[in-house]
């Protein structure tokens, strides 16, 4: 199941804007555990990743972080190899990317930079705490689907049998479209817009 199909099933929503893989050909899906940091510091990340659950996708929220890497190879190794998480997703920046690629670490992030956050404890403000609580409610316990196109989040309220059936329908429809265009030599207008295959199936 691709991120495109999942997003389509949610009315073309759910994308983690700007988050892309550091290496091609990777795929991960799993329950999200939410981690956050703020104000150009990664102190809070070090605190929270001690308590990661196994087999989760770690979503790292960067609140008021100004184009600095949240962490690099050391922390990613701890998250993946020691805490047994599946993958790391963030809308923020990362560093030590060559090392993470060599490790085979699956990471989706906004961009890369050699400049990292400060390892300094910062006091959380009421405004940041409010943002954190809102984002934690949305991300924690949701499902992340990650591939070469990016990351899509399935909110907790959509984790239902009904939504699963919708995903299956769209996946099958995609197969029908490819069959019509590639094997039956239809054009995309007849296939996608007019859906003429429905007329064939009703005969």
Regions found by a protein language model. Give the residues of each.
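Feature captures the catalytic cores and cofactor-binding loops of soluble hydro-lyases/lyases
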Residues: 1-140, 154-188, 192-203
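Conserved beta-strand-loop-short alpha-helix elements that form
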Residues: 139-151
């Amino acid at each position: 199941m691709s991120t495109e199909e999942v997003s389509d099933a949610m009315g073309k929503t759910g994308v983690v804007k700007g988050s892309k893989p550091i290496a091609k050909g990777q795929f991960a899906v799993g329950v999200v555990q939410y981690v956050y940091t703020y104000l150009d510091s990664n102190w809070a990340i070090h605190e929270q990743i001690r308590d990661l659950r196994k087999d989760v996708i770690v979503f790292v929220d960067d609140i008021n972080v100004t184009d600095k890497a949240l962490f690099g190879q050391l922390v990613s190794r701890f998250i993946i190899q020691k805490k047994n998480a599946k993958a790391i997703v963030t809308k923020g920046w990362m560093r030590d990317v060559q090392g993470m690629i060599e490790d085979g670490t699956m990471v989706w992030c906004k961009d890369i930079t050699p400049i990292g956050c400060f390892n300094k404890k910062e006091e959380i403000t009421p405004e940041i705490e409010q943002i954190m609580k809102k984002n934690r409610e949305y991300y924690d316990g949701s499902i992340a689907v990650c591939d070469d196109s990016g990351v899509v989040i399935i909110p907790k309220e959509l984790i239902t049998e009904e939504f699963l059936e919708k995903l299956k329908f769209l996946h099958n429809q995609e197969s029908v479209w490819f069959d019509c265009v590639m094997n039956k030599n239809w054009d995309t207008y007849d296939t996608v817009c007019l859906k003429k295959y429905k007329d064939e199936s009703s005969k």
